[in-house]
């Protein structure tokens, strides 16, 4: 819920109502997420309501997921905070007909550069790849990406080895639908 609420967050009392849990359970869950540095609490806006105001819980902006979108002529890399805010985006041109291994290399170099230049104080939870083609759901193996000329390519596994990060992949259109329905 905190992730889906974006930058606006939810108050603890809203989380209690939305999740159907009692206040002490919500306090314990929020406390645990805070100790993991996945959420942050801030003071609520001033209002004229009676009683003690409930803190607002938001997703931490320093915890990010990286995205990779291989295209025919470029690879787009982005950093997205847990609340859904895009922090950085870079498009790196690639040669026509680049194979999967070449795309892995360009992606890994762009990620390394982006992390060093702009995101050194952020914690990466993983990389999500939006592939314009058929992707095997259980392991992200690219079965067929006709626009890229890729057939049976272990792009996800190779990118994980090259970056040392967890990598997941899915069809780009399916991911777009999921993002639209979530945010």
Predicted segments with their positions:
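Nucleotide/phosphate-binding catalytic cleft detector across ATP-hydrolyzing
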Residues: 1-50
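A short, glycine/Asx- and small/polar-enriched loop/turn
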Residues: 50-53, 137
């Amino acid at each position: 819920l905190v992730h889906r609420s974006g930058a606006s967050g939810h108050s603890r009392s809203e989380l209690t109502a939305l999740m159907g849990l009692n206040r002490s359970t919500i306090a314990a869950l929020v406390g645990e997420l805070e100790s993991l540095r996945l959420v942050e609490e801030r003071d609520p806006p001033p209002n004229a309501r009676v009683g003690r105001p409930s803190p607002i819980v938001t997703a931490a902006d320093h915890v990010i997921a990286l995205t990779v979108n291989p295209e025919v002529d470029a690879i787009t890399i982005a950093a997205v905070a847990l609340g859904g805010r895009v922090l950085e985006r870079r498009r790196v041109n690639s040669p026509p007909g680049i194979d999967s291994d070449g795309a892995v290399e360009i992606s890994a170099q762009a990620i390394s550069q982006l992390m060093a230049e702009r995101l050194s104080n952020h914690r990466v939870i993983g990389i999500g790849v939006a592939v314009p083609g058929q992707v095997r759901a259980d392991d992200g193996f690219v079965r067929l990406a006709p626009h890229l000329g890729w057939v049976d390519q272990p792009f996800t596994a190779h990118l994980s080895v090259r970056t040392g990060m967890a990598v997941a992949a899915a069809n780009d259109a399916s991911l777009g639908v999921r993002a639209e329905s979530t945010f």
